[in-house]
């Protein structure tokens, strides 16, 4: 995974997330939408063949937090949820 920043302002961040596709892009988008300070978030894949694994994101916040902080919080939330799934899976296997 590689992040390439395209545009950065106080309450706006546009970036490419190289090496990912719709699976992670949807997860990140939905997790960002849960943050009340995120006013807009969306991604697009600009070309289905040439850029299939390089979604372009746009994140806009209300100015109370930066888009970078919103992304940091979303990443932590995704990690915590993945850990919950792993713990539940391990518990289910052990019976």
Curated annotation (Swiss-Prot):
It is an enzyme of class 2 (transferase). The keyword Mitochondrion does not apply. It catalyses: RNA(n) + a ribonucleoside 5'-triphosphate = RNA(n+1) + diphosphate. This is DNA-directed RNA polymerase subunit Rpo11. DNA-dependent RNA polymerase (RNAP) catalyzes the transcription of DNA into RNA using the four ribonucleoside triphosphates as substrates. One of its GO terms (molecular function) is DNA-directed RNA polymerase activity. One of its GO terms (cellular component) is cytoplasm. It is found in: Cytoplasm. GO terms for biological process: DNA-templated transcription.
């Amino acid at each position: 995974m590689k992040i390439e920043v395209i545009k950065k302002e106080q309450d706006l961040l546009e970036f490419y997330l190289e090496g990912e596709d719709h699976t992670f892009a949807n997860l990140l988008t939905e997790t960002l939408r849960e943050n009340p300070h995120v006013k807009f978030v969306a991604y697009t894949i600009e070309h289905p063949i040439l850029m299939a694994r390089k979604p372009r994101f746009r994140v806009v916040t209300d100015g109370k937090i930066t888009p970078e902080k919103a992304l940091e919080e979303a990443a932590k939330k995704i990690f915590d949820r993945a850990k919950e799934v792993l713990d539940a899976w391990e518990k289910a296997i052990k019976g």
